[in-house]
């Protein structure tokens, strides 16, 4: 039996559920609804965000790698953004007038989350390609359609990378 283990880091993108509780979906939903955007702590903690297409490409490369490469291999984006930067980008991309509100940081919340993707680069020749702005634009587009049933046609909503399989 072939075994591959990948460790996934903070993935976002179209087809996320609006109530999944993750920071990207929370901020987008709050901004689109004109609600205050809730930041826990001072917002200077950092996170990295991996767009779903990049994740899928990394996973497919791992699945198609030689049998002696089993992992674990980190699949994520090592570029860090503060939570404040993320909130401000979401406000900008949605055109929202949302205000930022700050609540106490949970005691177990790390100041930084950033994957080391050295093995993915070395063994799979993989690195993320989608910049945060582009990924957020696609994700906001999806959420607008999902939340408001806008005039967005399904074929206009970006689709994640789909591999072609041969028989």
Ranges and model annotations:
Residues 10, 14, 29-167:
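C-terminal substrate-binding subdomain of Rossmann-fold SDR/epimerase-dehydratase oxidoreductases
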Residues 22:
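Acidic donor-binding loop at a coil-to-helix junction in glycosyltransferase catalytic cores
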Residues 1-14, 25:
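Conserved beta-loop-beta element that borders a ligand/cofactor-binding pocket
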């Amino acid at each position: 039996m072939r075994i591959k283990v990948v460790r996934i880091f903070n993935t976002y993108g179209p087809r996320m559920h609006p109530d999944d509780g993750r920071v990207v979906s929370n901020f987008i939903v709050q901004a689109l609804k004109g609600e205050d955007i809730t930041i826990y702590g001072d917002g200077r903690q950092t996170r990295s965000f991996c767009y779903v297409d990049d994740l899928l490409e990394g996973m497919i490369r791992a699945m198609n790698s030689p049998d002696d490469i089993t992992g674990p291999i980190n699949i994520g984006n090592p570029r860090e953004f503060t939570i404040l930067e993320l909130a401000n980008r979401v406000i900008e991309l949605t055109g929202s007038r949302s205000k930022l509100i700050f609540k106490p940081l949970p005691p177990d919340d790390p100041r930084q989350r950033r994957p080391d993707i050295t093995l993915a680069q070395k063994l799979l020749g993989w690195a993320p390609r989608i910049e945060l702005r582009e990924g957020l634009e696609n994700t906001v587009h999806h959420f607008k359609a999902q939340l408001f049933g806008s005039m967005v046609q399904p074929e206009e909503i970006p689709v994640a990378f789909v591999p072609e399989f041969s028989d």
